[in-house]
Curated annotation (Swiss-Prot):
A Pfam family that the UniProt record links to this protein: HEAT_2
Cellular component GO terms, alphabetical: phycobilisome
Secretion signal span: none
Protein name: Bilin biosynthesis protein MpeV
Function, as annotated: An enzyme involved in the biosynthesis of bilin.
Annotated family: Belongs to the CpcE/RpcE/PecE family.
Domain of life the protein comes from: Bacteria
Record's keyword terms, sorted: Antenna complex, Phycobilisome
UniProt key word DNA damage: no
PANTHER family given in the database record: DEOXYHYPUSINE HYDROXYLASE, PBS LYASE HEAT-LIKE PROTEIN
GO function terms (MF aspect): oxidoreductase activity
Lineage: Bacteria, Bacillati, Cyanobacteriota, Cyanophyceae, Synechococcales
Length: 301
């Protein structure tokens, strides 16, 4: 596939100014000297355009120097970088522009980052655009959550969005907590995963209510995910009680995950309930997991 076909609505692509190999070398050396001397880089439009042209150079080290230089220029370079990311006919330039925006962390770039994420057919551009959104932090949470419910978002893009939310984590906790009441189960699931993505946040006292409420979510996938998370809780007594109640869940996947977490927590007090369920369970996979858990827990009795 040619570069010009990498962006939806490819008629809108633009040809970025190019530098000859010699021009790129001279500019790169000049930028290196300025930065080494502590001299602020030129931030006029002509200088920025030259550095952006350098993002299309075939030599990776030179591209990196131009990207770092644009990152040093900062917000003044954002409009031109966004334009290059959205409209360049060179995929190398679009990729480099998106990666460079990660260095600047400017919330004003969010609309263009969302557009590149949705419309550019190149997966590297998509990933770099999402990386730039993650670097921005809290202000990017709502746009990222909105992408989860976008009708054209692919499974790969959903994975990238979930990664970004987990990366933002505590920095976006207020917005993520508000998302727990969303009518969209995909958004609720992403918010829970982001808020509990690290062991310290998972075990924070304020997240107990989150996990308790999520254990009763209408979406069985969320309940199953919570059952797995409970197996990593440090407050094992609290987690065990919730997991034992989950053993009566109508969804077999929730029951299976609850049994596995109880086994992980060495919940010997759950043995009577597990033995009772073994006789009643109809799902063959859950029965096998029950047998394994009962055997393991009896060995530690």
């Amino acid at each position: 596939m040619s570069d010009s076909n990498q962006i939806k609505n490819s008629s809108q692509t633009q040809q970025v100014n190019t530098l000859s190999e010699e021009e790129a070398l001279v500019l790169s050396a000049h930028l290196k000297e300025q930065r080494s001397s502590g001299i602020p880089l030129d931030s006029d439009q002509k200088s920025i355009d030259k550095m952006i042209a350098g993002l299309g150079d075939p030599r990776g080290l030179l591209r990196l120097r131009f990207a770092d230089s644009l990152g040093s220029v900062g917000q003044a370079a954002v409009p031109a970088l966004c334009n290059a990311m959205l409209s360049s006919d060179q995929v190398t330039v679009r990729r480099a522009a998106a990666k460079t925006l990660t260095l600047i962390e400017d919330p004003n770039s969010l609309p263009d980052l969302v557009s590149a994420f949705l419309n550019d057919q190149d997966s590297v551009v998509q990933g770099s655009a999402m990386g730039a959104m993650a670097a921005i932090g809290e202000e990017a949470v709502t746009p990222i959550l909105n992408l989860l419910s976008h009708p054209e978002t692919t499974e790969m893009q959903i994975g990238l969005a979930n990664w970004a939310l987990a990366f933002i984590g505590d920095r976006g906790s207020k917005t993520l907590r508000n998302a727990l009441s969303s009518g969209n189960s995909t958004i609720r699931k992403a918010a829970i995963a982001a808020l509990t993505s690290r062991i310290d946040t998972l075990n924070a006292d304020e997240n107990k209510d989150l996990l308790s409420n999520a254990s009763n979510d209408d979406d069985s996938e969320i309940r199953a995910e919570v059952a797995t998370l409970l197996g990593a809780m440090e407050d094992t007594d609290w987690a065990k009680l919730l997991l034992i109640s989950n053993l009566d869940d109508p969804d077999s996947w929730v029951r299976k995950n609850s049994v596995l977490s109880l086994m992980k927590l060495n919940a010997k007090e759950a043995l009577p309930k597990l033995e009772e369920l073994e006789l009643q369970e109809k799902d063959r996979i859950v029965v096998n997991v029950l047998k394994l858990a009962i055997q393991k827990l009896r060995q530690t009795d």
